[in-house]
């Protein structure tokens, strides 16, 4: 797959939907799973920018699965806005833990329930989405979901004590708050700009040889569509190194304020 991708890179076929589908499905089919759920991200922060192109890709991957007797479901989800309230590495793990304990952000929690219920129905563990969502409720409320997460970490030799309440596991040396200069409903115009700022903080790589700063990231104190008062903290940036003041300008240029809310869909479409 890596060799084929290198060829696509130099032949102008990176955007080829049949080649994208074969790249994704070759890896998914190799897992041996009979039921596979694919989350196709769509929007300015995703590889697939157009909903119709995303649907075309989804349908093609379902057809590939059918030819090999696999049950495939595809969800097309929104990447116009950041999902949840965190962007980074450790900071996203902590958000996942909050969600497993029933305290996650509304949009991220909805993705969990939507994807989980789709897969439970696909695998015939639940008769419909209503029953499936009740099953997810149960394992979150009785802590089975969180305890399974701890078991995964432990069985791979990880230290689960880092997730205890008094742990200093997430301990960035530098932080910078970004303050609202006006009031109104927050709108994030470009999710990709938030990803680029997180990368510049150290949460991602711009070159293969770059190292990752696991403390680096962004916390969204305010989310898209939330009403903000002038002087409120909008976002908090974290890093293990001094934070470039220019990054604040980059985030502020990626947002705007309006007098009314705007429509946001978490899941655009489901294909089965």
UniProtKB/Swiss-Prot annotation:
The keyword RNA-binding does not apply. Its EC number is 2.4.2.4. Keywords: Glycosyltransferase, Transferase. Transmembrane segments: none annotated. Gene3D superfamilies: Nucleoside phosphorylase/phosphoribosyltransferase catalytic domain, Pyrimidine nucleoside phosphorylase-like, C-terminal domain. It comes from the Bacteria. Homodimer. Belongs to the thymidine/pyrimidine-nucleoside phosphorylase family. This is Thymidine phosphorylase. It comes from Metamycoplasma hominis (Mycoplasma hominis). The gene is deoA.
């Amino acid at each position: 797959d890596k060799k084929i991708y290198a060829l696509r890179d130099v032949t102008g076929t990176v955007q080829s939907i049949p080649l994208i589908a074969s790249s994704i499905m070759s890896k998914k089919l190799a897992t041996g799973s009979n039921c596979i759920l694919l989350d196709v991200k769509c929007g300015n922060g995703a590889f697939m920018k157009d909903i119709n192109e995303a649907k075309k890709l989804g349908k093609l991957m379902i057809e590939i699965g059918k030819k090999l007797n696999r049950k495939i479901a595809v969800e097309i989800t929104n990447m116009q806005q950041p999902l949840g309230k965190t962007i980074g590495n450790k900071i996203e793990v902590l958000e996942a833990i909050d969600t497993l304990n029933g305290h996650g952000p509304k949009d991220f929690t909805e993705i969990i329930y939507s994807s989980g219920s789709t897969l439970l129905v696909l695998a015939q563990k639940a008769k419909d989405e209503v029953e499936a969502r009740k099953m997810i409720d149960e394992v979150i409320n009785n802590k089975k979901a969180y305890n399974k997460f701890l078991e995964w970490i432990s069985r791979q030799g990880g230290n689960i004590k880092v997730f205890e309440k008094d742990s200093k596991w997430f301990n960035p040396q530098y932080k910078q708050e970004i303050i609202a200069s006006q009031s109104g409903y927050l709108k994030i115009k470009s999710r990709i700009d938030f990803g680029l700022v997180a990368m510049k903080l150290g949460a991602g790589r711009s070159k293969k040889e770059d190292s990752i700063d696991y403390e680096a990231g962004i916390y969204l104190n305010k989310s898209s569509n939330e009403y903000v008062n002038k002087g409120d903290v909008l976002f908090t940036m974290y890093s293990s190194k001094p934070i470039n003041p220019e990054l604040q300008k980059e985030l502020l240029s990626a947002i705007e304020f309006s007098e009314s809310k705007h429509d946001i869909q978490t899941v655009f479409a489901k294909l089965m």
